[in-house]
Amino acid sequence: MKKIALSTLSLALLGAAGAAHAQSSVTLYGVIDTSLTYVHHTDGNKNLWALGNASGGDLSGTRWGLKGQEDLGGGLAAIFQLENGFDPSNGRLGQGNREFGRQAFVGLTSQTYGTLTLGRQYDPVVDLVQGITADNYFGSAFATPGDVDNYDNSSRTDNAIKYLSPTYAGFQFEAMYALGGVAGSTGSGQTWSLA
């Protein structure tokens, strides 16, 4: 009888531990987008085989990353994302030779109050507007020349403080302010964005 009670208690505790563990997560993800290119008679009578697209025209940036969430209770969770971009043909880092040059942020999220993040991240135009096209190569017809609005998803913002509202009656907004990072000049290099 004691063995059955102890076994039942052990199973109940194991189940409770599994439920508590399920509330937190860390995900490893990635995309390798490369190509094998053959060009006939590139320079006189030479043929060219190359790994990767020499013009940089692969459809999606190669990347790997970690993202996670830790439940803090009361509907609040801590979140983070670290995303590395690299060239799959030679292993070189992208985004100015940064280890996590695509994204590197931490934050808090709540279904009631929204999400606040701090770090290197995309601006609100990329998060809420750019997604209506498949990618920046075919969707660039909607971007402004020179990508001054970052709709073409060509830049990330350092030192950014970003807030994403919860959805109210089908409406959601996102606002961002990025510190300039110029010592002695608080307004120099700052970024504002709203979508």
Residue ranges and their predicted role:
Residues 24-38, 49-180, 188:
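Outer membrane beta-barrel
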Residues 189-195:
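Detector for outer-membrane/organellar transmembrane beta-barrel domains
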Residues 1-23:
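Gram-negative bacterial Sec-dependent N-terminal signal peptides
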